[in-house]
């Protein structure tokens, strides 16, 4: 593939990820909220054991979102001209996950419920490291910079969604503009079908 075609495909993949993000965050939360009472005893939902299952899942949704957003550059790194970088990438993400787990879980709170919540936070932060490393190691940082306004909206909107859902406040409404990426997402899907 030519560099121009590669950039076009990377932008289309990013458009698709931007378009999927709000649906995944809100859809995942809605599914968990609906099915959690069917799958878990009340003690896992009311905070008896520390963090509720819904709270833990909501924090993990942040990690899902960050992993989704890393997909285009992660894939570019994996399929790039220097496959050894992908091995180094995996090693660095693993080391970051171990460090975050050590600090937040092993050295963190003593109560088991809080440890579980801390583990979810560590997992989501590891996904953030994965995203940042995929940008840097794939050599696609310029493509990301070129779309910095969109990335800023995605990060701010996604943060408001997660913060609002975790705190059960209306902060999530400030993430609704992410649905504006739906049209770009559909356009990206249609272009892959042509």
Residue ranges, per PLM feature:
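Specific pore-lining/lateral-gate transmembrane helices of multi-pass inner-membrane transport
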Residues: 1-90
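Short, surface-exposed helix-loop/turn micro-motifs enriched in polar/charged residues
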Residues: 6, 117, 143-146
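Membrane-embedded alpha-helical segments of multi-pass transporters/permeases
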Residues: 25-33, 38, 59, 98-103, ...
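Membrane-interfacial segments
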Residues: 35, 39-44, 108-112, 141-146, ...
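Membrane-interface helix-loop junctions in multi-pass transport and translocation proteins
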Residues: 54, 84-86, 90-132, 163-177
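Hydrophobic, membrane-facing alpha-helical anchors
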Residues: 60-75, 120-136
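Alpha-helical transmembrane segments
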Residues: 73-82, 133-149
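Membrane-proximal transmembrane or re-entrant/amphipathic helices at the cytosolic face
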Residues: 143-154, 158-194
